[in-house]
């Protein structure tokens, strides 16, 4: 007899967006898990992958935009790179407070930007960033697999300088896709992500990926596949 299927991360029609900003940011005592509204937002086992994303976003130096702060895993790695400025968008009150405290300790200038990216990104100037790292949590069942495309299409391409690098992830989506539809992570990315990148204006020969081996803990609710994929998307 097979084990019962795990409860999906989102129920049909579920929308966390109205309550997300003010909801408590539940960092556990060991600072290895962050939950908001009961959703598994981030876990420290992701560290090697977050560091790969950070390295990609900071690879051109200069001014880096990070969308979503979480547990500061990627942000701390970005600060180790020879960058000039580090702009960070975060909407949750508790996470933003942690961002403000963290910013005071960093070697490079941090510009904390409070709000949903949908509110903040339109206020940012064109061709302003050398690198972008987008890693926010989906706030509804409707946008579970697609929220990153809205940012990429509406903002990422225009915000990057020519030669700038976009990297991003949606582990909550990709974990589900690798569980239910795909066995090869590169194929998953090619079929579900590349079309949206092309639509946003990026060229196919400027879209690369790197795959790393990383085995999640057995109790991780959102990701079980033993590989992770890092997009490296350059604006021409």
Swiss-Prot record:
GO terms for cellular component: cytoplasm; nucleus. Converts guanidinoacetate to creatine, using S-adenosylmethionine as the methyl donor. Important in nervous system development. It comes from Bos taurus (Bovine). Pathway: Amine and polyamine biosynthesis; creatine biosynthesis; creatine from L-arginine and glycine: step 2/2. The modification N-acetylserine is found at residue 2. This is Guanidinoacetate N-methyltransferase. PANTHER family: GUANIDINOACETATE N-METHYLTRANSFERASE. Its EC number is 2.1.1.2. Monomer.
